[in-house]
Amino acid sequence: MKIQLVTPAPLKLNNGNKITAVRWAGIFKKLGQRVRVTQNYDGKPCDVLIALHARRSADSIRRFHELHPALPLIVVLTGTDIYRDIRHDLNAQRSLEIASRLVVLQKMALREIPKPLRRKTRVIYQSAEPIRASRSRANGIFDVCVVGHLRGEKDPLRAAMAVRDLPSQSRIQVTHIGLALDPRLEKTAKQEIRRNPRYRWIGHLSHGKTRQRLARSDLVCITSKMEGSSNVLSEALASRVPVVASRISGLMGTLGNRFPGYFPVGDTERLKALLLKAESQPKFYRDLTRYCARLSDRVKPKREIEAWRRLLAQFA
């Protein structure tokens, strides 16, 4: 089977969509398929089109369907699709209607899909290979890692704000990895570095180096306002690094309702209290670590591979 995988993200940009597309291309090859990854549908022959992003890939989805109405078309919904665009954007809504199958990346996203379309929707959790790295407390630092480009949906400076005025005995330090995609947020981040000795923004790292840095941290902090799912969350769970996360559907669909590390979106004081609790209360930190470790099975690559195998087999 020849698969064309369309992702609207520039292939040189190291973001979630790019990471997802590269991982899926590897999965399809393991399943014995031939795959090409492009930003747009280019009209070249393929047996199935898989498009990431209902709105941003809408032109590719429409063109493929017009040219090949009998061929399978799989549309993968992102966070902005699920929690914004499919409610109001006609192009996104049309993408859902004409797709042979829809894919969402965590179970709570199903609630947002129009009821008549849920029967053709599949949940496929994002996976990650485990990376083991030693965490050294020799320097006394409690290392909190934030991974996310500087753009509004990520609320990327929330962790920095939460550690501004911690008690002097706290050893929390926040390390932030990500590109500046918003000039205003870039300016704010640079100001934050000058005023906040607990915050470091180190900019872009390769995906491999980012994963190593994440695996060495004591805690991963995910502050997003909107997510379809999160590669960073899957990578933290795979490496058994405990997480604190904003209470949003896109994260709750993987973490579950009983996860003890939630804070309300944008609530700096609640996040501050949660970070201090993780640092200063060993029992809470152990409970958080154990909860996240139990979820590591959910993000194992073999589960994602099998889910895609079952889906593609429907069109073989």
Annotated model-derived regions:
Residues P242-A245:
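Short hydrophobic beta-strand element within catalytic cores of glycosyltransferases
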Residues N257-E269, K277-K283:
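Conserved acidic donor-binding segment of nucleotide-sugar-dependent glycosyltransferases
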Residues K225:
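Aromatic "clamp/platform" in nucleotide-sugar-dependent glycosyltransferases that forms part
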Residues G16, S280-A313:
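A charged, aromatic-enriched C-terminal amphipathic alpha-helix characteristic of glycosyltransferases
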Residues E97-I131:
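A short, active-site helix/loop in glycosyltransferases that binds the activated sugar's phosphate group
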Residues R135-R164, V174-I177:
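Conserved donor-binding/catalytic core segment of Leloir-type glycosyltransferases
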Residues I19, R151-D165, R184-K187, E269:
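A conserved mid-protein helix/loop that constitutes part of the nucleotide-sugar donor-binding site
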Residues Q173-K187, W201-H204:
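Glycosyltransferase donor-sugar binding loop
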